[in-house]
Amino acid sequence: MLDVATSAPSAALPAEAAEGRLDLGALFTESEVPEFLAELDEGLIGLKPVKRRIREIAAHLVIGRAREKLGLTSGAPTLHMAFTGNPGTGKTTVALKMAQILHRLGYVRRGHLVSVTRDDLVGQYIGHTAPKTKEILKKAMGGVLFIDEAYYLYRPENERDYGQEAIEILLQVMENQRDDLVVILAGYKDRMDRFFESNPGFRSRIAHHIDFPDYEDAELVEIAKTMAADADYTFSPEAEVAIEEYVAKRRLQPNFANARSIRNALDRMRLRQSLRLFESGGLADRAALSTISEGDVRASRVFAGGIDAPDYKPQTE
């Protein structure tokens, strides 16, 4: 379970209404939301449709605050969301940024993100589920609760499954305490669609559905370079070409997980580079210690027609 706290202070927007008018540009700037959106743009490669939706939601919330300042009706917005898409497409990262935005605008008190799965909510025996679920909700209050692979909460084929108890508690809190908690349900799009069909209570409480597309090959190559640079590594020119080929081949294999697959592949490349340098002996400068060679990339089983190590293993249903 992940519990990430943000450092942004909770404060009302410091804008002044003069003669019944507001400077929306100043209001937006003073909210610090542009900073969070810029971080989202710079920190996440691709995902243009997702960034657009987050920008729309942020703008709607800022305008809602402006309406309040001028005495217009601005009821509490429903902010529960559904993030759908394949693994490794940035859903958790965007959820954390959304928590920061909501906190800065005063829609949640603390602005932290609590990330959970079914195992964190559902017990294994009678009387175990309610305390587990309520404890998680208590920890998430004032922030955002992110439930990954939310459809695993619902297992109608098992009459003795306790997931339904967790669902009922969640639905009640999402309705009655929506001014103090935002819930984001995440998972594969097709499974989430079936989950909502079987649980209309969730569908009626979700205001924003955001689909996270798979990354393009070029975007994954750029992600690999960025991840390497963040760890003080670079690819040789030949290795960059090999990375492009790796991405194209790896995408066709089972359990491909977008950026997660790239991160895991990079970890293996670094291991190969370390072994290569260790076995070579002799002197090594900064360039040698930080450069991933073509051989470090092509040593992957992907290039031999084999199956790369699994990057994502979904739960069994």
UniProtKB/Swiss-Prot annotation:
Pfam families: AAA, AAA_lid_6. This is Protein CfxQ. CDD domains: AAA. One of its GO terms (molecular function) is ATP hydrolysis activity. Keywords: ATP-binding, Nucleotide-binding. ATP binds at residues 85-92. InterPro entries: AAA+_ATPase, AAA_lid_6, ATPase_AAA_core, CbxX/CfqX_mono, CbxX/CfxQ, CbxX/CfxQ_RuBisCO_ESX, P-loop_NTPase. Belongs to the CbxX/CfxQ family. Necessary for the expression of RuBisCO. SUPFAM superfamilies: P-loop containing nucleoside triphosphate hydrolases (SSF52540). It comes from the Bacteria.
